[in-house]
């Protein structure tokens, strides 16, 4: 364990809570002390839901540890079963309760409750939230379907042709506190419907026990979020023979590849390659003259595995950006993230220390950061534009409007979210670059009269006095930037200005120069070939 100001993922019981809260008719009894009830806020504050998550806490206190905490667990399990009468009951423990080793799942299993009881054993000190969500969904689905597993899988993917109906697929993986999951589901449903494909079950988001029991009736499973659903899709394939798609439809190219894969698995005629050009505005802009400003922009990407990999492909193949950093906090997705980074000639950053991520970001000196809420803070400190592409997120990244990431409309949303910060960055740079032009000087004549001229002149005088005084006040050994050096530095775009300043100061120390003038800046640029 470590003490930190920020964590990308919570403990695994938060992942279990996400699954329980995403479904209906499912209740979660969590053996936990008073302090672990904070998780309710994640759903009411960030997701802005109108109801609390379906969780009952045992909320034991320090004085309870001297007594029989097992009886406390059984009492709360019975009360939850009687009060909520769920279709399925999840029983687990928080990271703190794990130390007591009361084994609440085993206690609940022996109580003879009328509903299915699913025991969750989530190692809090070695696993984290996404793994907890994946394991919970897997255990719940496996517990409900184990009685109907056939002796030998005999699934016919093209049974829909013989039965005279449209093909049917399940969408697996979307959950609460996922990044735009609700909107992605609606967009993918619409996308598949346009191609004559029905959606049978969406799980866990919005699903109930009866929906889980209907999962084997689908012709194909669509794994939308591998972090949550890949293990469940693999189990369904092994035991029922139902194949699953592995392409996540985020971006123009990935959406087309997704449709091709789904059509191939279902035995359907593949879609037209030009469909994306007809349904999304992103390709048109990418081929326009205006987009040449974006070509070669340096981008640093960090997030969960699914969104980081998708972002890297969009940046490198569809927008013409140069990816200078790629990483993820999700160790379960480390292998595919490393493979994606290798294709781009990079070494992936697999790390959950936000300070290490910020240091890597500063070292890469990007012009745009695509990351989580934490990268937004880090980028703000470094003066770099940023767009959030992944959880963890702030409430502002859970819009009330529809704002998907998947499908053709998702490509439009992504384009807006990623390109606009760069456009605003260009505007800010131009304003800064021409700040001292005669048309921008406060003392310039204007239709507003002469009220501001004298004051502006005084301000410039004050600034020049302050600038000239800095050289005398600078402590010995500290580098001094001359007025012409500072003026030249300000002409450099703000998103790379920090790197140029560091290079110039490093060069000045190397050659023993105490003052950095415009000439020193040019020499440093030539030295570093930047």
Swiss-Prot record:
Its BP terms in the Gene Ontology are: light-independent chlorophyll biosynthetic process; photosynthesis, dark reaction
- The keyword S-adenosyl-L-methionine appears for this protein: no
- Whether Protein transport counts among this entry's keywords is no
| Cofactor remark | Binds 1 [4Fe-4S] cluster per heterodimer. The cluster is bound at the heterodimer interface by residues from both subunits.
**What broad class of enzyme is this?**
oxidoreductase
Q: Where is the active site?
A: 290 (proton donor)
Q: Which GO terms describe its molecular function?
A: 4 iron, 4 sulfur cluster binding; ATP binding; metal ion binding; oxidoreductase activity, acting on iron-sulfur proteins as donors; oxidoreductase activity, acting on the CH-CH group of donors, iron-sulfur protein as acceptor
Q: Which UniProt keywords apply?
A: 4Fe-4S, ATP-binding, Chlorophyll biosynthesis, Iron, Iron-sulfur, Metal-binding, Nucleotide-binding, Oxidoreductase, Photosynthesis
Q: What does this protein do?
A: Component of the dark-operative protochlorophyllide reductase (DPOR) that uses Mg-ATP and reduced ferredoxin to reduce ring D of protochlorophyllide (Pchlide) to form chlorophyllide a (Chlide). This reaction is light-independent. The NB-protein (ChlN-ChlB) is the catalytic component of the complex.
The protein's name: Light-independent protochlorophyllide reductase subunit B
**Species of origin:** Synechococcus sp. (strain WH7803)
């Amino acid at each position: 364990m470590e003490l930190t100001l920020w964590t990308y993922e919570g403990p695994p019981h938060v992942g279990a809570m996400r699954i329980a809260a995403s479904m209906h008719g499912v209740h979660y009894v969590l053996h936990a002390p008073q302090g672990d009830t904070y998780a309710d806020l994640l759903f009411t504050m960030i997701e802005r839901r109108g109801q609390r998550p379906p969780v009952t806490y045992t909320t034991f206190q320090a004085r309870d540890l001297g007594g029989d905490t097992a009886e406390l667990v059984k009492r709360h399990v019975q009360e939850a079963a009687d009060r909520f009468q769920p279709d399925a009951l999840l029983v687990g423990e928080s990271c703190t309760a794990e130390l007591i080793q009361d084994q609440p799942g085993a206690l609940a299993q022996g109580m003879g409750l009328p509903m299915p009881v699913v025991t969750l054993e989530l190692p809090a000190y070695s696993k984290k939230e996404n793994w907890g969500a994946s394991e919970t969904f897997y255990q719940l689905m496996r517990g409900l379907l184990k009685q109907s597993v056939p002796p030998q899988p005999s699934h016919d993917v093209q049974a829909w042709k013989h039965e005279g109906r449209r093909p049917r697929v399940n969408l697996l993986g979307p959950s609460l506190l996922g990044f735009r999951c609700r909107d992605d589901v609606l967009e993918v449903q619409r996308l598949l419907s346009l191609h004559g494909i029905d959606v049978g079950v969406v799980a866990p988001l919005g699903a109930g026990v009866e929906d889980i029991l209907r999962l084997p009736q689908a012709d194909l499973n669509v794994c939308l979020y591998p972090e949550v659903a890949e293990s469940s899709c693999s189990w369904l394939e092994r035991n029922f023979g139902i194949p699953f798609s592995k392409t996540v439809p985020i971006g123009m190219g990935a959406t087309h590849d997704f449709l091709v894969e789904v059509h191939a698995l279902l035995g359907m005629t593949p879609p037209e390659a030009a469909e994306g050009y007809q349904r999304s505005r992103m390709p048109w802009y990418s081929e326009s003259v205006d987009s040449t400003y974006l070509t070669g922009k340096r981008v640093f990407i960090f997030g969960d595995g699914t969104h980081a990999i998708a972002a890297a492909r969009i940046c490198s193949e569809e927008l013409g950006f140069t990816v200078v950093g790629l990483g993820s906090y999700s160790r379960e997705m480390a292998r595919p993230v490393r493979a994606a980074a290798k294709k781009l000639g990079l070494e992936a950053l697999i790390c959950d220390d936000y300070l290490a991520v910020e240091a890597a970001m500063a070292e890469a000196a990007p012009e745009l950061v695509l990351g989580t809420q934490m990268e937004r803070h880090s980028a703000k400190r470094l003066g770099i534009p940023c767009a959030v592409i992944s959880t963890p997120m702030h409430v502002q990244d859970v819009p009330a409007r529809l704002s998907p990431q998947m499908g053709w409309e998702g490509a439009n949303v992504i384009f807006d979210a990623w390109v606009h910060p760069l456009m605003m960055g260009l505007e800010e740079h131009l304003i800064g670059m021409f700040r001292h032009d005669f048309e921008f000087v406060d003392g310039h004549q204007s239709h507003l009269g002469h009220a501001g001229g004298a004051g502006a002149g005084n301000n410039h005088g004050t600034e020049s006095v302050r600038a000239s005084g800095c050289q005398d006040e600078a402590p010995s050994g500290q580098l001094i930037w001359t007025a012409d050096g500072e003026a030249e530095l300000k002409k450099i775009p703000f998103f790379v200005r920090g790197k140029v300043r560091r290079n110039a100061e490093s060069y000045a120390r190397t050659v023993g120069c105490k003052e950095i003038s415009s000439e020193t800046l040019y020499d440093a640029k030539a030295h570093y070939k930047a």
